[in-house]
């Protein structure tokens, strides 16, 4: 546990040193944990492996592996990716690409469960929290059923492409 805390502090120092998170300047601290973290100064990347968890402004990202690139200011999360937004919605995927403020997320095979029990599934999603999000191969149902375990809702809405405007 002490090692994990050390690595967490080390990763925070690396992120702060690199200027990886503009959110730090906005007073939105990022909490970061992983079993192992390696930094490559030559290509400006960081690799976090095992029980990776990042928290910021009421949002949480967990994954098996997260790769961060300083130049692109993007993180790629792979394996058992779970993103919980500030409203409590749970979004799962095998892979997500995120900016450091969690305001732009690209995901493949997205499965979302909302606090009211409804669910949303998409083959892919380009999510922008402050503008228009686009989803391909989407499906929505207000049914509070276990869709991930194969339960089928009585009805659902399906679309080849869905656009969501936050306004």
Positions of predicted regions on the chain:
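Structural signature for solvent-exposed beta-strand/loop edge elements and short helix-capping sites
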Residues: 25-167
């Amino acid at each position: 546990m002490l090692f994990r805390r050390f690595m967490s502090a080390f990763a925070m120092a690396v992120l702060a040193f690199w200027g990886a998170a503009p959110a730090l300047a906005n007073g939105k601290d990022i909490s970061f944990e992983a079993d192992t973290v390696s930094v490559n100064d030559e290509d400006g990347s960081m690799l976090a492996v095992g029980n990776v968890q990042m928290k910021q402004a009421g949002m949480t990202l967990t994954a098996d592996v997260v790769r961060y690139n300083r130049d692109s200011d993007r993180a790629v999360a792979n394996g058992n990716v779970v993103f919980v937004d500030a409203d409590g919605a749970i979004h799962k995927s095998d892979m997500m690409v995120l900016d450091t403020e969690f305001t732009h997320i690209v995901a493949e095979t997205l499965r979302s469960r909302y606090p009211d029990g409804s669910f949303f599934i998409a083959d892919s999603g380009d999510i922008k929290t402050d503008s228009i999000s686009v989803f391909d191969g989407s499906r929505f149902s207000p049914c509070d059923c276990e869709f991930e375990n194969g339960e089928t809702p009585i009805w659902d809405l399906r679309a080849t492409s869905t656009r969501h405007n936050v306004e």
